[in-house]
């Protein structure tokens, strides 16, 4: 009896299709997709069309345009990054709206506290329930926290020019530090050889030091 075949989730199938599009950087018609995706992604050709349509209608990660009498499909990496950026901007806007709501409810709550902790009170022509307002305030705060966490996740994976440059600089500093360390090791081996007549090969073997250190390319 052969090994049990592992089930691939719907999301994993979509991820494989997305990687296929972004790695090839090419435009396709549906017949080409139904031929290439099963080979590259291990997905049944019977469901390729439905999955691609879901990624257009529901996920919005694949683009489609009618060209003559056929549809052309594509998805480039910059489109995905732009979608993440748009999502972060939308979350920022919603957070700002919620903050405005909180400020309004806080003013109403402060008025309530100033006149005593009554369960029900009136501001202008409108009546309010203190417990209901406190519950709504808590829900809004929880929503802000949730959206803020989502925004932080999105911004943490979005690389702009400044972030790329910063990471390059950090890598350069680490490379310089590594080069100094390897130079010091070579100097120490030479010192032990001259001072105590210990063979370099013996020292390297004893401490697990390679004959040559790996060279790092410039970034």
UniProtKB/Swiss-Prot annotation:
<dbReference type="GO" id="GO:0003690">
    <property type="term" value="F:double-stranded DNA binding"/>
</dbReference>
<comment type="similarity">
    <text>Belongs to the MND1 family.</text>
</comment>
<dbReference type="GO" id="GO:0007131">
    <property type="term" value="P:reciprocal meiotic recombination"/>
</dbReference>
<dbReference type="InterPro" id="IPR005647">
    <property type="entry name" value="Mnd1"/>
</dbReference>
<dbReference type="GO" id="GO:0120230">
    <property type="term" value="F:recombinase activator activity"/>
</dbReference>
<dbReference type="InterPro" id="IPR040661">
    <property type="entry name" value="LZ3wCH"/>
</dbReference>
<dbReference type="GO" id="GO:0005634">
    <property type="term" value="C:nucleus"/>
</dbReference>
<dbReference type="Pfam" id="PF03962">
    <property type="entry name" value="Mnd1"/>
</dbReference>
<comment type="subunit">
    <text>Heterodimer with HOP2. MND1-HOP2 binds preferentially to dsDNA.</text>
</comment>
<comment type="function">
    <text>Required for proper homologous chromosome pairing and efficient cross-over and intragenic recombination during meiosis. Stimulates DMC1-dependent homologous strand assimilation, which is required for the resolution of meiotic double-strand breaks.</text>
</comment>
<dbReference type="GO" id="GO:0007129">
    <property type="term" value="P:homologous chromosome pairing at meiosis"/>
</dbReference>
<keyword id="KW-0469">Meiosis</keyword>
<dbReference type="Pfam" id="PF18517">
    <property type="entry name" value="LZ3wCH"/>
</dbReference>
<protein>
    <recommendedName>
        <fullName>Meiotic nuclear division protein 1</fullName>
    </recommendedName>
</protein>
<dbReference type="GO" id="GO:0120231">
    <property type="term" value="C:DNA recombinase auxiliary factor complex"/>
</dbReference>
<keyword id="KW-0233">DNA recombination</keyword>
<keyword id="KW-0539">Nucleus</keyword>
<dbReference type="InterPro" id="IPR040453">
    <property type="entry name" value="Mnd1_HTH"/>
</dbReference>
<dbReference type="GO" id="GO:0000709">
    <property type="term" value="P:meiotic joint molecule formation"/>
</dbReference>
<dbReference type="GO" id="GO:0000794">
    <property type="term" value="C:condensed nuclear chromosome"/>
</dbReference>
<dbReference type="GO" id="GO:0010774">
    <property type="term" value="P:meiotic strand invasion involved in reciprocal meiotic recombination"/>
</dbReference>
<keyword id="KW-0238">DNA-binding</keyword>
<keyword id="KW-0175">Coiled coil</keyword>
<feature type="coiled-coil region">
    <location>
        <begin position="88"/>
        <end position="181"/>
    </location>
</feature>
